[in-house]
Regions:
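Hydrophobic anchor at the beta1->P-loop junction of P-loop NTPases
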Residues: 6
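ATP-binding Walker
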Residues: 12
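ATP-dependent small-molecule kinase phosphotransfer cores
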Residues: 42-115
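Walker A/P-loop
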Residues: 15
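P-loop (Walker A) phosphate-binding loop of NTP-binding proteins
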Residues: 9
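ATP-dependent NMP and nucleoside kinases share a basic, alpha-helical "lid"
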Residues: 104-112, 117-153
């Protein structure tokens, strides 16, 4: 079973494309099995909500994000993290091992079930080191105005969007340098999903692209 990363800046449309790919029966037939997906960022969000030990470790770094009951205020946490690059790196170093473990479990489960492909959705595939374990990466991107519009619809303010974009500065360049295949998600949803499906067929059938995208 192959494992392919799906990375790109916030608001680019990664989740929409991943959903379309997992539902693409023609693609599954061509690849020879089911297409599974795991959202590494969602795994970490769940861990922050459900793991008291992780909550304590994060609160030690960001005391202002700790609520009286020990849970974390995600808004305060994000605000602090995206204002301080050093803090963001420390938080990522604390959490990414959990994502790596979840991805390994999903991969083993997929192999046991006979699945053909596991899609690993994450923004920071390169910086986290997760790309080293994958067979390739798709870079999903869209023009800034489209991404900003999607994020405003999610409830983020222009200031919050600016901070997150600053934290992800250079992401596209690093992904392309690492061999990621670019997917233009500024087109229609169907066109973007079709382009991503074609890229996966190429990666899975010929092995083209960097088998160690971080190398």
């Amino acid at each position: 079973m192959r494992a392919i990363g799906v990375a790109g800046p916030i608001g680019a449309g990664k989740s929409r494309i991943v959903k379309a790919l997992t539902e693409d029966r023609a693609l599954a037939r061509d690849l020879g099995g089911e297409i599974l997906a795991i959202d590494a960022d969602a795994v970490l969000r769940e861990a922050r909500q459900s793991s008291p030990s992780l909550q304590r470790e994060i609160a030690a770094l960001v005391p202002e994000a700790r609520r009286e009951d020990g849970s974390l205020d995600s808004t305060r946490l994000a605000s602090a993290a995206f204002e301080r690059p050093d803090l963001l790196r420390a938080l990522e170093a604390l959490q990414w091992p959990l994502a790596r473990e979840a991805i390994n479990l999903a991969r083993h489960a997929g192999e046991a079930s006979g699945a053909a492909l596991l899609l690993v959705e994450a923004i920071a595939l390169i910086d986290s080191g997760l790309a080293e374990t994958l067979d390739g990466v798709l870079l999903v991107d869209a023009p800034r105005e489209i991404r900003a519009s999607r994020l405003l619809d999610r409830g983020l303010t222009a200031e919050e969007i600016g901070r997150r974009e600053a934290a992800q500065s250079g992401l596209r360049t690093r992904l392309l340098a690492a061999g990621a295949i670019p997917i233009d998600a500024g087109r229609t949803a169907d066109e973007a999903a079709a382009a991503a499906a074609d890229a996966l067929r190429l990666l899975c059938s010929t092995g083209e692209g960097n088998s160690n995208p971080a190398g």
